[in-house]
Amino acid sequence: MAAVLTFRRLLTLPRAARGFGVQVSPSGEKITHTGQVYDEKDYRRVRFVDRQKEVNENFAIDLIAQQPVNEVEHRIIACDGGGGALGHPKVYINLDKETKTGTCGYCGLQFKQHHH
């Protein structure tokens, strides 16, 4: 739940102020999506001695933030992440208030009720 609240808080920031994307530590090492970065003298850096640390630069939070809010007609929406083996358990999201945007706790997709 804390991740959803953090995600919502980040989405309210102006695009220039968001901290999305690959960041680099003071030592020049890329920081992963989990914030993993090692000190210069950390023994765990031995696995990157003769090779570069590979970090996927397409963080999921960046990709979800680019998705537009889905406008739906119903008051309650069911999200299953696309269904099948690639989806997630079905969750139901209430969209009762006019200004409310419902966010799926699994995949981060946002839904808003289209009022006539």
Swiss-Prot record:
Disruption phenotype: Male and female mice are fertile but produce smaller litters and pups have a lower neonatal survival rate. While mice are normal during the first 4 months of life, they are prone to rapid onset weight loss and sudden death after this period. They display cardiomyopathy associated with a doubling of heart weight, impaired systolic function and a reduction in functional capacity. Males are most severely affected, with a propensity to develop cardiac failure and diminished survival after 4 months of age. Defects are due to membrane respiratory chain NADH dehydrogenase (Complex I) deficiency. It is a peripheral membrane protein. The modification N6-acetyllysine is found at K90, K112. Keywords: Acetylation, Electron transport, Membrane, Mitochondrion, Mitochondrion inner membrane, Respiratory chain, Transit peptide, Transport. InterPro entries: NDUFS6 (IPR016668), Znf_CHCC (IPR019401). Residues 1-20 form a transit peptide. One of its GO terms (biological process) is regulation of mitochondrial membrane potential. One of its GO terms (cellular component) is respiratory chain complex I. The keyword Cell cycle does not apply. Pfam families: zf-CHCC. Mammalian complex I is composed of 45 different subunits. This is a component of the iron-sulfur (IP) fragment of the enzyme. Accessory subunit of the mitochondrial membrane respiratory chain NADH dehydrogenase (Complex I), that is believed not to be involved in catalysis. Complex I functions in the transfer of electrons from NADH to the respiratory chain. The immediate electron acceptor for the enzyme is believed to be ubiquinone. Belongs to the complex I NDUFS6 subunit family. This is NADH dehydrogenase [ubiquinone] iron-sulfur protein 6, mitochondrial. The lineage of its organism: Eukaryota, Metazoa, Chordata, Craniata, Vertebrata.
